[in-house]
Structure formats: structure tokens, C-alpha cells
Amino acid sequence: MERSFTLAPSLLSADFSALDRALVYLEAHGAQWVHLDVMDGHFVPNLTFGAPVLRCLRSKTHLPFDVHLMVSRPADLIEDFVQAGADFLTFHIEAEVHAHRLIHAIRGRGVKVGISLVPSTPVAALSEVLPFVDLVLVMTVNPGFSGQQMIAHCLSKVSALVQMRTERGYSYMISVDGGIDCRTLPQALDAGADVIVSGSAFFSGTLRSLLCKDSSGA
């Protein structure tokens, strides 16, 4: 793997009773961002972190927090997560009719903006907002739970986003989230991913072993 990328481990796969120690662990094992999956039990069938959790963790690490809002009403949560210390706020195009309004509201608070799409949503759904976002998060599993296998054909969206970025002069980063392991990481990078979100494979050690082997040239 010669192509560089940003590693953003997901705290969804960490021990929820020891998140502060998980941050230390991330820093010690090459993480560049912290990915925080916020779930409301409505947009996805799970409940996870709220803004108070981010507020408590913010002082525990220098790493940027990449907050992924998997919620039905993202606009209601923006101010809380801005105040809590989010560096990126990513919401789903499927959850927000007034996407331009929300993008500009987030940017106006000095936070970088991401837009995400689930596996069943085509890249074309993002065409009107791509000029205004800093990050596009391509879900390669149906969101809600860690440890799922990648839906491989979703990587074609990454390639399409790379092509659109080049042809239209956009500057967004492309993140891939879902089913990243030793087998699928090279595939995601070959497709053009700039940011890799990994949960289970990172915390289990399998992905870290691959990264260490690659960096050593073994």
C-alpha cells in the first residue's frame, strides 16, 4: 500500500466503559482522527453517543473528532456537537431535505462539513451539494452496527467521486466506512479513499498488524 491516507478509528468498537483509555490507544497506534458514530435509534437501529460524551473526551486527545450523525434530525444536534468540540460534522443526505441550509449552518460555526450516503443511495443524490462540503463519507455497510462485511460494489461510488472531484475542481476528501479489514483496505485505497474508518479490525489488532507490516516494508 503505497498510497497515503488518514486513519480514523471508530469508537463504536471500543470499550464504552473506558473511552478515555481507547483514545490513548488510538494515539499510540497511528490514528490521525477519531471517528464518533452518533446514532439515535431511529435513523439506524442502535443508540450510541451524545454530545456530553464528546465534551468529556475532547480534553483527552489532540486528535480531531470526526462526528458522524446517523440521526433523523441532524439539524437539531449541530449546536450541541459544535459546543462539545467536533472538528467535522457529517450528516446523511437521506435525513435532511434542506441540505444546503444545514451545510452553511455548520460551516458558519467554524466546523468542517461532511455529507454521507448509505449503500442504497446513488452518488447522484449528492450532486447539488458536493461543491460545498469538505468530506464525503461513503458507507460500505448498512449503518448501525460494527463488525459487518463490506458491500464491495459500494466502492464504485468512491471511484465516481474521485472522477467528479477531478473533472469539476472540487476539493472534498473521500472517506470509506464499513467492513474495512486487511482484505478490503487495499481495495478502498485503490478506489481512491482519502480517509479510512475502521472499528472492529482496528481494535482487534488485525488491521494494525497490516499497517505496521506495510510501514516496515516487510
Curated annotation (Swiss-Prot):
Function: Catalyzes the reversible epimerization of D-ribulose 5-phosphate to D-xylulose 5-phosphate.
Database matches in Gene3D superfamilies: Aldolase class I (3.20.20.70)
Matches recorded under Pfam families: Ribul_P_3_epim
CDD domains cross-referenced by the UniProt entry: RPE
Keyword annotations from UniProtKB, A to Z: Carbohydrate metabolism, Isomerase, Metal-binding
Protein name: Ribulose-phosphate 3-epimerase
Residues bound to a divalent metal cation: 35, 37, 68, 177
NCBIfam families: PRK05581.1-4 (NF004076), rpe (TIGR01163)
GO MF, one annotated term: metal ion binding
Active-site positions on this chain: 37 (proton acceptor), 177 (proton donor)
Lineage: Bacteria, Pseudomonadati, Spirochaetota, Spirochaetia, Spirochaetales
Cofactors, names only: a divalent metal cation
Family named by the database record: Belongs to the ribulose-phosphate 3-epimerase family.
